[in-house]
């Protein structure tokens, strides 16, 4: 399964929007180096969340705010977990079909 393509038909895990702007947003918080990310390149697709354009922009803003960085990181990683639950459920449905 291509995780980036799969995101296109999904709703946003943060707000529920299904507005055609949902993408696999890559985690880029303070732990990004642990997940293969760094300056100039994205981390592993496994550490991504289905976010709409508005929620993606909100996460970008909060990650850049030093006062909110760790809280935003925890929230983003929660969204990644919700995305993985969705992916696992979809894979299970495909196997059952």
Predicted ranges, named:
Residues 1-28:
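Short cysteine-rich loop/turn motifs with clustered Cys
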Residues 22-30, 49-59:
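Histidine-centered catalytic micro-motifs
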């Amino acid at each position: 399964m291509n995780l980036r393509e799969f995101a296109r038909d999904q709703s946003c895990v943060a707000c529920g929007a299904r507005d055609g702007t949902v993408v696999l947003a890559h985690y880029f918080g303070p732990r990004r180096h642990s997940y293969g990310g760094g300056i100039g390149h994205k981390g592993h697709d496994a550490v991504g969340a289905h976010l709409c354009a508005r929620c993606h922009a909100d996460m970008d803003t909060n990650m850049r705010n030093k006062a909110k960085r760790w809280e935003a990181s925890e929230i983003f990683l929660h969204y990644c977990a919700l995305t993985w639950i969705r992916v696992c459920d979809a894979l299970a449905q495909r196997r059952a079909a």
